[in-house]
């Protein structure tokens, strides 16, 4: 199982926004090699607190697990998004949770799915799986940065 698939599973299991998961997603999908080097240099020189500070500063407040708009930026170019929100006023009475399901599909019919407590979490999971599929198929470099999966 790839690092990106593990991140997708973490997004699906989250019960709400997770800043530490946002940071890990950013490092694995969005960060440039130079940004990853800056974070690692901070970690080596000053520890994990400095590394987290550097990531937070470079991310500029983006929260993939909290914001549907932010999660949409993770979807690879040319992929289509389908979102389903299974929020139901009867769900708590039946012991069910609210659930979002997201699928992203490429024109050549490669499709992946994610689910989560919110649509942002579901879409983040699906987008991570899309990146993993691209890397596995050789259409995206295996590791765009030092933190890649």
Model-inferred region functions:
Residues 1-121, 125-149:
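Glycine-rich anion-binding surface patch
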